[in-house]
């Protein structure tokens, strides 16, 4: 399995959550700030303090803030394109790929590779779930990972609007909540299972500024359609549920679809 950057240290405490204090509004603000912190620490490599005392339900609450992690990742890559660095387009695109992978700790890319090995295997759903836990990278994962990197590199070097990476990163982390909420968890003990049942409406509000950029709403529809189809196929291959690795796969698929939308000039409206 492709080794991502070390994940943030989180300790899930199964003990009951503490009772709300006498000032419920202040307590809720603290819980929401913790959810934001957890989302940024889990989905990015930003230099943030470790999240401590993670309670059951915190990951589900944090999923509403996934689009904000997209602003951090996509915004920095968009900044690289906006600066118009005096380097060949291929070099700038390679720097963009490296920055994208570095800011995510290769978390979603790792899920893409693991999912490809499992989903393309001619095995039973139970055996595919076992493959997801295998630490080795197979031919399907290697080929899919290389193809995804080539697509990302080609699209970033295709003269995209500078804001395209920002839209891609934000939209991908919004639309992934749809299959996360629609399908059961393939493995109940995983972090992916604990991230389900997120607040779609709040995530949409956070993504709204990005959706107001030129043609972003249409790109989001393309990404949502693609993610819906891939999620349905993956769920059938895994016996009806999805895993955290598949969530990573869906984020990468959505990002590439949005970048492809801008790269191929599908902006008629």
From Swiss-Prot:
Q: Any transmembrane segments, and where?
A: 63-83, 87-107, 137-157, 158-178, 202-222, 246-266
Cofactor dependence: Mg(2+)
Membrane topology recorded in Swiss-Prot or TrEMBL: Multi-pass membrane protein
Is Transmembrane helix among the key words of this record? yes
Q: What is its main location?
A: membrane
Query: Which keywords appear in this protein's UniProt record, sorted alphabetically?
Result: Cell membrane, Cobalamin biosynthesis, Magnesium, Membrane, Transferase, Transmembrane, Transmembrane helix
Q: In which pathway does it act?
A: Cofactor biosynthesis; adenosylcobalamin biosynthesis; adenosylcobalamin from cob(II)yrinate a,c-diamide: step 7/7
Per UniProt, what is one Pfam family of this protein? CobS
Per its UniProt entry, what is the enzyme's top EC class, as one word? transferase
Domain of life assignment: Bacteria
GO cellular component terms listed in the entry, alphabetical order: plasma membrane
Q: What is its EC number?
A: 2.7.8.26
Gene Ontology molecular-function annotations: adenosylcobinamide-GDP ribazoletransferase activity; cobalamin 5'-phosphate synthase activity
Q: What does this protein do?
A: Joins adenosylcobinamide-GDP and alpha-ribazole to generate adenosylcobalamin (Ado-cobalamin). Also synthesizes adenosylcobalamin 5'-phosphate from adenosylcobinamide-GDP and alpha-ribazole 5'-phosphate.
Protein family per UniProt: Belongs to the CobS family.
Spell out the PANTHER family in the cross-references.
ADENOSYLCOBINAMIDE-GDP RIBAZOLETRANSFERASE (PTHR34148:SF1)
What's the name of the protein? Adenosylcobinamide-GDP ribazoletransferase
Q: Which gene encodes it?
A: cobS
């Amino acid at each position: 399995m492709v080794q991502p950057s070390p994940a943030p240290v989180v300790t899930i405490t199964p003990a009951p959550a503490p009772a709300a204090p006498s000032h419920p509004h202040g307590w809720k603000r603290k819980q929401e700030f913790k959810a934001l912190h957890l989302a940024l620490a889990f989905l990015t490599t930003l230099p943030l303090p470790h999240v401590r005392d993670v309670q059951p339900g915190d990951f589900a609450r944090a999923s509403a803030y996934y689009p904000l992690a997209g602003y951090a990742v996509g915004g920095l890559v968009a900044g690289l394109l906006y600066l118009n660095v005096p380097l060949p387009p291929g070099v700038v695109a390679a720097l963009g790929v490296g920055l994208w992978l570095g800011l995510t700790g290769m978390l979603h890319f790792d899920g893409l590779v693991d999912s490809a090995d499992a989903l393309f295997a001619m095995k039973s759903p139970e055996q595919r779930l076992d493959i997801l836990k295998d630490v080795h990278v197979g031919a399907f994962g290697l080929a899919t990972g290389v193809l995804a990197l080539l697509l990302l590199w080609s699209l970033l070097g295709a003269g995209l609007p500078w804001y395209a990476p920002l839209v891609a990163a934000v939209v991908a982390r919004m639309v992934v909540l749809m299959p996360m909420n629609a399908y059961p968890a393939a493995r109940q003990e995983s972090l992916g299972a604990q991230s389900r049942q997120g607040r779609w409406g709040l995530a949409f509000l956070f993504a709204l500024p990005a959706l107001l950029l030129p043609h972003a709403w249409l790109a989001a529809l393309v990404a949502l359609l693609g993610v819906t189809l891939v999620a349905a196929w993956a769920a059938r291959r895994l016996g009806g549920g999805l895993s955290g690795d598949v969530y990573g796969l869906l984020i990468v698929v959505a990002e590439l679809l949005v970048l492809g939308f801008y790269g191929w000039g599908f902006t008629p409206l």
